[in-house]
Curated annotation (Swiss-Prot):
Signal peptide: none annotated. It is found in: Cell membrane. InterPro entries: Mntp/YtaF, Put_MntP. GO terms for molecular function: manganese ion transmembrane transporter activity. It comes from Heliobacterium modesticaldum (strain ATCC 51547 / Ice1). This is Putative manganese efflux pump MntP.
Length: 213
């Protein structure tokens, strides 16, 4: 496998993480949480294909499809929650005034990347450690399946998984930052758009798991 092919594959695997981070950035996320999310996604994009490459492609079809259903369920939950929040705020009004002050942090790396959730609803995406793990796993399921496939073609283990991890981590943080900028322009509608993005990724996972071969 050439480095060019490896890079393209890494970007493709990171696309789901980027899209999900875009939706999260629209809702609003602290810089610290954005970087933590990027780190967790990077680690999953290292260890899941690592396991897949070592295990080979013998169980790739079965495990890959089961993983896709799990990932789709998680993304449906996250997307549905964001859409519900957007609908509730449009119906009842924002929980705080639109001019709510932006959080600047306290010098400990906790400054906020403010998105629609913070500007309109007064909320920030503030995941627990467990939620970070679940989210990171949900967008890394394809990496497991790809690992099984790469195990049959003798792909170099360390360069492959490190490339996957670094690219996915960067794309995740970038998605949060871009989502921030989009939310400033779209306001409350950004939460709805972010939820639809997550639902779209979930549908993609389901369609992929249902396709033959």
């Amino acid at each position: 496998m050439t480095y060019w092919t490896l890079g393209v594959l890494a970007v493709g695997l990171g696309a789901d993480a980027f899209s999900m981070a875009l939706g999260i950035g629209m809702e609003g996320v602290r810089r610290r949480d954005a970087f933590m999310l990027g780190l967790v996604v990077a680690l999953f994009h290292i260890f899941m294909p690592w396991f897949g490459i070592l295990a080979g492609s013998a169980l790739g079809l079965v495990v890959g499809r089961l993983a896709s259903f799990i990932g789709a369920a998680v993304l449906f939950f996250l997307g549905g929650r964001m859409i519900y929040h957007a609908w509730k705020e449009k119906r009842e009004g924002p929980a705080f005034p639109v001019s709510v002050p932006r959080r600047r942090g306290n010098g400990s790396g906790g400054g906020a990347i403010v998105g629609a959730g913070a500007i309109v609803g007064g909320r920030l995406f503030a995941p627990t450690r467990w939620e970070l793990v679940v989210i990171g796993a949900a967008v890394s399921m394809d990496a497991l399946s790809v690992g099984f496939s790469l195990g049959t073609v003798g792909a170099q283990l360390l360069p492959t998984v490190l490339t996957f991890g670094v690219v996915a981590g960067i794309m995740t943080v970038a998605g949060c930052r871009i989502g921030q900028q989009v939310s400033r322009m779209l306001g409350a509608t950004a939460q709805l758009a972010g939820g639809l993005i997550l639902l779209g990724i979930g549908i993609k996972l389901l369609l992929g798991s249902a396709s033959p071969g």
